[in-house]
A protein has these predicted regions:
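Generic structural marker for isolated residues within well-ordered, non-membrane alpha-helices
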Residues: 86
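A structural signal for small-residue-enriched, beta-sheet-centric alpha/beta enzyme cores
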Residues: 1-66, 70-80, 91-373, 377-404
Length: 404
């Protein structure tokens, strides 16, 4: 790992400021670009603007992102304001407006304070830097209910990949061709099709596998910008990008609104046929259940076990693919120093040991299928998936009852 987040990539400058709950970040760095965006049909104005930019141009010279207002469900005025943000960044940085991506995060239904953004842009532009402090300031500027900035940079051979992200609530991304935002830069020499393939794979295994509250934002966005110059194989780049995105995604899950515990769910499906899509569905739906999350907050392993079983049965009942018999299930809970098996081949085993639930990190391992009754000679296949999330606390309710 490297210091510097996005600024670890040569030629990238960034900075950001916050005024109370309103922030603004600028990132400057030209390159080929691809993105992944929310599948929510109520797409925010900046997301529509940036999607069009990538379709028409395919290059980004700068990103301007504000926090404190989502500019979502804001009609024609919202689109004009998104366009105005791009104009402001274009003017102060001396880049073409058609290469300025726009992102916003915050409450839905409010118009942007363009006068404030115009003033903030001038201040931020004066302080743009390629030093690590620039990335850190930009990561802080896009925070809303986040409690800490999220940034990471790694080396894959000679190639650098750096990113910043934000997210704490309204986290149940469905990113496709994520409120969480992530901006990733690299100096890898890649064509856009390779970038698009690698980013989709990375998002499918990271941001699309985190759940805080089960609500999909109108503003979720992940951008990948390649400045080029360093050679790397597509496979090696994909491995590095997957790692970086998973680590950023786990930071978001750890920082879930009001969270007291970080939860990892590992699902293995055994039998024929099985699919990774089903394994992912089950892992996500377990973490989406408010009953499961509240039982973990209450440190009740018995309640958590029963509610997980119900969640599995519920999501597999509507699955379009074939899954193993849900009755053939095994389940373990793991803490930092303890491991408790609660279900083996569809039967409750042992006593309820609530001590394993008292740590800050809980891992739940679930195996479906492959138990007693499997046909002799039948070839067993396995599909696995991992999802990350957090518990549901009283603080989450209080925070969202009086949001910002």
């Amino acid at each position: 790992m490297l210091r510097g987040g996005i600024c670890a990539v040569s030629g990238v400058r960034a900075y950001g400021i916050r005024e109370n709950n309103r922030g603004l970040a600028l990132i400057e760095g030209k390159g080929k670009a691809v993105g992944m965006f929310t599948m929510n049909k109520m797409k925010a104005a900046p997301l529509i603007f940036t999607q069009r930019l990538l379709l028409e141009n395919g290059r980004i010279s700068a990103i301007i992102a504000n926090s404190g207002c989502a500019n979502s469900f804001t009609g024609e005025e919202g689109m004009r304001n998104a366009n105005r943000m791009a104009e402001l960044a274009s003017a102060v940085l001396g880049v073409d407006k058609s290469e300025v991506a726009v992102a916003s995060t915050g409450p839905i239904g409010k118009q942007l304070d363009i006068a404030m953004i115009a003033r903030q842009v001038q201040e931020v532009a004066k302080r743009l830097t390629s030093d690590p402090e620039g990335s850190a300031a930009a990561a802080k500027a896009i925070m809303t209910t986040d409690t800490f900035p999220k940034e990471l940079a790694i080396k894959v051979g000679e190639v650098t990949i750096g990113g910043i992200a934000k997210g704490s609530g309204m986290i149940y991304p469905h990113l496709a061709t994520a409120t969480m935002l992530a901006f990733i830069y690299t100096d890898a020499e890649l064509d856009r099709e390779t970038m698009r393939t690698c980013l989709k794979d990375a998002c499918d295994n990271s941001f699309n596998m985190i759940v805080v509250d089960g609500d999909m934002s109108t503003n979720d966005m992940v951008l990948l910008v390649s400045r080029g110059g360093k050679e790397i194989s597509a496979e090696n780049f994909k491995t590095g990008l997957n790692y970086l995105c998973k680590e950023l995604a786990k930071m978001i899950a750890r920082d879930g609104e009001g969270a007291t515990k970080f939860i990892e769910v590992n699902v293995s499906l055994k039998g024929a046929p099985v699919s990774q899509g089903d394994a992912k569905l089950i892992a996500r739906e377990i973490l989406r259940s408010p009953l499961v999350k509240s039982a973990i907050f209450g440190e009740r392993i018995d309640l958590a076990c029963g509610r997980i079983i119900a969640a599995i049965g519920s999501c597999t009942s509507t699955s379009t693919s074939t899954v193993p018999e849900v009755e053939v299930i095994s389940m373990k809970f793991r803490g930092k120093e303890q491991e408790v098996e609660v279900v083996r081949n569809g039967r409750i085993v042992g006593r309820w040991n609530h001590e394993v639930m008292k740590g800050k990190e809980i891992t739940i391992d679930i195996v479906l299928g492959g138990g007693e009754g499997e046909s002799e000679g039948e070839k067993e296949t396995t599909a696995t998936a991992t999802a990350w999330g957090c518990d549901l606390s009283c603080d989450y309710v209080m925070l969202n009852a009086s949001m910002l």
